[in-house]
Amino acid sequence: METELIRYIEREFHAKYYDITALDFSKNRKALKYINGVITKLTKPIFFFVKPDLGASMRSMEMEDVCYFILMRGEPSTSRELTEIAHEFGHLFYGEKGYPRAVVVNGEYANIERATIISNAVMDPLINRDLHNAGLDIVEYMQYAIKVQATELMFGYPEYSKLDKYQRNNIKCLIIEKIQEWDIIQNAIPNVFVEIADKKYKRILMESRNFVKRINATGTNNPEKCKKLLEMLTKENNISDEILIA
């Protein structure tokens, strides 16, 4: 059964199975400790796959009532990548606890990024705070994000007046996430995302700061609060008819 399941995922996602037990965690033992703590709380088996054309460096997914699996763009080896694996386990952990996630209404995999970035605005800081409290180096993790995401924010989008609603949603959710994450590390490094937004997208930056205030006022310590926040965010960003909070 397990072999058939692995082969099915390989075919469906054009990915290759990766044996996580062979991975060397000596570079990041705190990531391993966090993962070991989470994995005992998961009710389904988890598998790993390498998918070179993955739009993100990693993505955790669920085959309902059957298993979890994590897609990775490449075989992990660095300390930062091990932290990222721990982060994906965090998503699975909170999913088991009933925390919400955003899903595309029509279910098209091609549009999954629109849903993911909504979820990440609330859930990523929640998970990264856990990692930080567990002693993982999330500054290293965030510096990698700067290289990838800040460059896209600076050069990958047009001026504000030419943004479509999906681009505005992406930028706003990204800034909401990064403001919270820099609060976790007490601004130990410059928040390049805010600096770029202050130059290019002042209105979005203002909206993002206001939404972070709403997050802080509401709290994220239970699934209901997080669902309420994500529903407010989709409505505010004019995509509530396309993105469902489940």
PLM features: residue spans?
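Short helix/loop segments within enzyme catalytic domains
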Residues: 129-157
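Auxiliary, metal-adjacent structural segments of Zn-dependent hydrolase domains
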Residues: 2-68, 77-78, 113-115, 134-140
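Charge-rich, solvent-exposed alpha-helical interaction surfaces
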Residues: 8, 12, 16, 31-34, ...
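Post-HEXXH active-site segment of zinc metalloproteases
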Residues: 79, 94-125
